[in-house]
Amino acid sequence: MLGLAVTRLRITQIRSSVGEKQNKRGSLRSLRLRHVGDTVDCDDTPQVRGYISACSHLVRVEEIH
């Protein structure tokens, strides 16, 4: 894997999870997001993309290099 650039994602929670279904709240928890304004950097993997798609209306996603 030397020389391969791994795409990273910066994920920011922009809306509260209050009133959301349990699976969407669980996706935020799996992404290590607890409060509005929290930001995490993650590798771009299918698992992370699945979490993002489950709660896409609650988060903002940026690609970083």
Swiss-Prot record:
Species for this entry: Tropheryma whipplei (strain Twist) (Whipple's bacillus)
One Gene Ontology term from the biological process aspect of the record: translation
One Gene Ontology molecular-function label: structural constituent of ribosome
Protein name: Large ribosomal subunit protein uL30
Subunit structure: Part of the 50S ribosomal subunit.
GO CC terms of this entry: large ribosomal subunit
InterPro entries from the UniProt entry: Ribo_uL30_ferredoxin-like_sf, Ribosomal_uL30_bac-type, Ribosomal_uL30_ferredoxin-like
Protein family: Belongs to the universal ribosomal protein uL30 family.
Keyword tags: Ribonucleoprotein, Ribosomal protein
